[in-house]
Amino acid sequence: MKKADIGLVGLAVMGENLVMNMESKGFTVAVYNRTVEKVDAFTGGRAAGKNIVGTHSLEELAAALERPRKVFLMVKAGAAVDGMIEKLLGVLEPGDVIIDGGNSHFPDTIRRTKLVEEKGLLYVGTGVSGGEEGALKGPSMMPGGSPAAWPVVKPIFQAICAKVEDGSPCCDWVGENGAGHFVKMVHNGIEYGDMQLICESYQLMRDLLGMTDAEMHEVFAGWNKTELDSYLIEITRDILAHEDADGSPLVEKILDTAGQKGTGKWTGIESLEEGIPLTLIAEAVYSRSLSAVKEERVAASKVLSGPAVSFDGDREQMLADLEKALFASKIVSYAQGYSLLRSAAKTHGWKLRFGDIALMWRGGCIIRSVFLGDIKKAFDKDPELQNLMLDDYFKDQLETAQAGWRRVIAAAVMNGIPVPAMAAALSYFDGYRSERLPANLLQAQRDYFGAHNYERVDRPRGEFFHTNWTGEGGSTSASTYNA
C-alpha cells in the first residue's frame, strides 16, 4: 500500500477540512484523533472512498507515512500541543517534521522549535487563516520554524493555500522559529482593528444618520466596489441583509457583547514590549472588553447623561466622509501593524519580507482585501519603508481623506457616539506627523520627581542633563527607579 504524503492529528472541523483540501490536491493523508471513534466516523463518512487513511495510534500514524514524515497538528493551542509533541518525539525519527497549525503564541513556537531541533527533528509553526471555509478551499498560510523544513512542506502548503488572481500562492516562508506565528498574531490584531472600524461606521450610520439595515446594506455593497473592497466589508453587507424568522434584521436581535480568543490581546501586549504604538488595535481589543460588561453599561446609561443625537446636515456628504474616515483609519491600522512587524524582526533576528507578507494576506484570510496589493507595491518599491503612511500612495490617500475623517470624528464626539478606533487612528496620524510633541514637559516631570535626566534641543543627541528643580534634590540622577 502506498505510504501517505502527510499525517494530520486533530479532526475538529478545521482539521477535517484541511485533510479534504490536501486530498483534493492529490495528496494521500493519514489521520489520527485522540478519540479514535472520530477517525472511524470521518473515514467512513465524508472521507469514504478518498485517499485518506485512518489510524488508531500515533505509532500506526508514523508507520503510514513516507519519509521524511510530516505530521500536521490541528489541536488546541497550549498544553495539548506540548503533550502531542512529546508523544510524537517518541515515534518519529531525525529529519521528520512536526507542524503546528493552531493559534499558538509565538514564544511557545520559539521554545518548541528549539526543543524539536535538539532531538534532530524539524519544526514548523504556521499561521492558518480563513476559518473553516478557508481550510477547505484554500487558507492563507504563514509558516515559520526550522528553515530546513520549508523544502519538505512547501509543495503541500503551496498546493493547498489560497491563490491570488495571477496564481501566486498566499503562502511563503516567513522566517525562523516563531516568525510565522508572530505574523499570524499581528494579522489577527489587524483583523480586530478592521472589524472595530466597520462596527463604528455601522453605529454612525444607524445612530447618527438614522439609517435602516437595508440602507446600510446598500452602502456597504457600494463600498465593496471601491478601495475598501474586502472580505469583512463583503460579509458586513450580507449580514445587514439577513432577516430573522419574523422578517426583521437578524443583526439587531444579536446581543451587543463580543467575545475574543486572546490573539488581539497578545498583539497589544507585544506592542508594549516592543515600544511600538499600536493604539488602534489596542482600542479594538478594549472595545470588546467594554462590550462584555453589558449589565454595567445598562446601569450607567440610566445615570450618566450625554448630548442628544441630532444630525441636520447632508447625509450623502457624511456618508462620503465616513467612507474616507474608514479607509484612512484602515491605513493607520496596517501602518501600526507593520511597524510592530519591523520592530519584532529586529528584536528576534527575523528577515521578514514585508511585501510578501501582504501577498500572503491577499487571499484566503479574514483580512483579505484589494488594499493589500498596494501594501505589496509600497514595500516592493522601498523594502526599508519606515512607516506605511510615508509611501506616496498612502500619503496621498490620507491627504485626500483628512478633511472628511476629521468631520466624522467631530460629529461623533459632539453627538456622544463612541468611535475609539477611528479617533485613535487620527490621533496617531496627528502625533506621527508632529515635529514637536509635549514630551519635553513629560521628561521635565520625570526629572523633577525621579532625577531621570533629559536631553536638550540646543545640544547633541545622547548628551544628558539633570536639574535640581527644588534646590533641595542635589545633582544625583536616577539609575534604578524608572517611571
What annotation goes with each model-predicted range?
Residues M1-R69, L92-G95, G131-A135:
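NAD(P)+-binding Rossmann beta1-loop-alpha1 motif at the extreme N-terminus of oxidoreductases
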Residues E399, G404-A483:
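C-terminal amphipathic alpha-helical interaction region
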Residues H181, R206, M211, T226-I331, ...:
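Interdomain hinge/lid region at the active-site interface
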Residues G222, K346-A378:
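Small-residue-rich helix-loop
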Residues V53-E60, A77-I85:
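Glycine-rich, highly charged phosphate/nucleotide-binding loops
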Residues V81-E86, I99, H105-H217, K225-P249, ...:
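Rossmann-fold dinucleotide-binding core
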